[in-house]
Each structure stands twice: as structure tokens, then as C-alpha cells.
Amino acid sequence: MPVRAIKVIISMIGLDSHTTGAEVVATLLRDAGFEVVYLGTNQTPAMIVNAAIEEDADVIGVSLHASNFALVEDLMSLIEEHELTDVPVVCGGNIPPKQIEQLLARGVARVFPPGSSGDAIVEYFAGQARRT
């Protein structure tokens, strides 16, 4: 039986229009053999969760800035509500250290700040997939 590619949702939550980081991560993951569903900008928590359900995603990647912190809280609540806690959420972006701690405490699997290595990102996503 063939093994399917790890499927990843990549999104920017809220009104964040800084696409470079998310696009770089999407490209890194595609080049590494992942199946990437790129949702783009202006995504709500509900849109991200719906995409994860529809696409049967293994991992959710969210790009955000500190001002969108509350939306990640909403995202994590929806993930719990839809019983998707086996789908890891990985965040990246320009996030203050205190908010990184809060995101991790809320259930975000990992936060990658600017300057994180591409190899580390790919390796982490590969290790977090719930099924391959």
C-alpha cells in the first residue's frame, strides 16, 4: 500500500498581509515532498479548521503577528470543539517571547520565529504528522 504525502495547511490568520514567511515555508515543505494546501491571507479560525477537516490535514501551519494572538486562541478552541487535537498547530511569525510561551501553553505544538532554519522547520513538520 503506498504511503501518502503528509498534508499540511498553511495559512495567515486575521488581517496579516505579510505573506513572505508563509510562502517560504509552503515552498520548503513542497520541495521536501509534503502536500501543501496554501490558504493565503485573511483567514479566520473557522476557515482554517474547515480546511483542515475537508483536506484531512496532518498538520496546520499558521503565520501570525502579535496582534493576531487572540485569533489563535479562537483557532485552538475550534480545534478542540471539532476534536482535531491530534492535528498539531505550528505557528510562525514575529511573535514576542511572552506570547510564544502563551501559545505553547494553549496547545500550539511549536512556534518558529523569524530566522528559523528551513531544515528545522521541515524536520519538525515531518515529526509532527499524525499519520503518513
Where are these regions (language model features)?
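Cofactor-cradling patches in redox/metallo enzymes
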Residues: A22-A32, V36-E123
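ATP-dependent carboxylate/acyl-activation modules
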Residues: M1-L39, N50, G127-T132
